[in-house]
Amino acid sequence: HMDHGEGMFHSKVQPTWVTPHPTDSKVYVTGNASHEIIEVDTNAWKITNRFKTAGKAPYNTDISSDGSRMVITLKGEGKTEIKNLKTGKSKLVNNTTKVSHGVVISPDNKFAFISVEGIGGEPGKLDVVDIRKAKLVSSIEVGKQAGGIALWKIEE
């Protein structure tokens, strides 16, 4: 038995997700507990920027294929943040329930698909957000524990 006299250590950042930039040598780390996104230059492996999110507990992120916008789920608020990576400005969209989880952007960069967990016995949902308008445009129930989400392009 080893007792070092210390309790369990919890990171002040509590990273939950890493998203690579589609055109630059950068990755973005989601700091759930620190309410921030951390930009890392992958050529030098150094932090090059840290920016606070517009709400609490960012969880997952995705970046548009042109690298201009980042969509961030704010699990602590039941909202989605759409951030313009060039200007730094953000817009918030309310999700249909309180526990926003996964996010993926459509290949045409028009929509963000957000998996939203149900609470208790409630079904989870898939919210669809128009990225340019920063507006919820559709939602559908998908069953319990709607967690992550992914899209892929099928070519003929």
Predicted regions and their residues:
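Predominantly soluble domains enriched in secretory-pathway, periplasmic, or organellar proteins
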Residues: 1-156
